[in-house]
Amino acid sequence: MRHYEIVFMVHPDQSEQVAGMIERYTGSITEAGGKIHRLEDWGRRQLAYPINKLHKAHYVLMNVEADQAVVDELETAFRFNDAVLRNMIMRTKAAITEPSIMLKAREERVKRDEMKFDADVE
């Protein structure tokens, strides 16, 4: 089995359905004997440029270990799902399990905001 990094962007109006989509996609990977090494839901983010007149999208990152057949199935599922605006499936040399830069930045921002809130309370 090979390692892949998968990023897909979901229409912002469909953000409530992202959890179900993640469950469906991870389920198809694990049923075929694959493994999920990293799964990050980055939430709604501003796009660098408009896609279909949209300026925001819901981002999801997955690092998986799977067979080519499963990756082809995912690619087809992304293509026929109207809620998925864009997707990227990239093969990697090894499993990546550490948090991404995007997640680290969000955690640092949350910590900074908590510290600021604590300082304001005192």
Curated annotation (Swiss-Prot):
GO cellular component: cytosolic small ribosomal subunit
The keyword Transport is assigned to this record: no
GO terms, biological process: translation
Family annotation (InterPro entries): Ribosomal_bS6, Ribosomal_bS6_CS, Ribosomal_bS6_sf, Ribosomal_S6_plastid/chlpt, Transl_elong_EF1B/ribsomal_bS6
Gene3D superfamilies cross-referenced by the UniProt entry: 3.30.70.60
Keywords noted in UniProt: Ribonucleoprotein, Ribosomal protein, RNA-binding, rRNA-binding
Statement: the UniProt record of this protein carries the keyword Ribonucleoprotein: yes
Molecular function in Gene Ontology: small ribosomal subunit rRNA binding; structural constituent of ribosome
Membrane-traversing stretches: none
SUPFAM superfamilies: Ribosomal protein S6 (SSF54995)
Family per record: Belongs to the bacterial ribosomal protein bS6 family.
UniProt function note: Binds together with bS18 to 16S ribosomal RNA.
Protein name: Small ribosomal subunit protein bS6
Organism: Vibrio cholerae serotype O1 (strain ATCC 39315 / El Tor Inaba N16961)
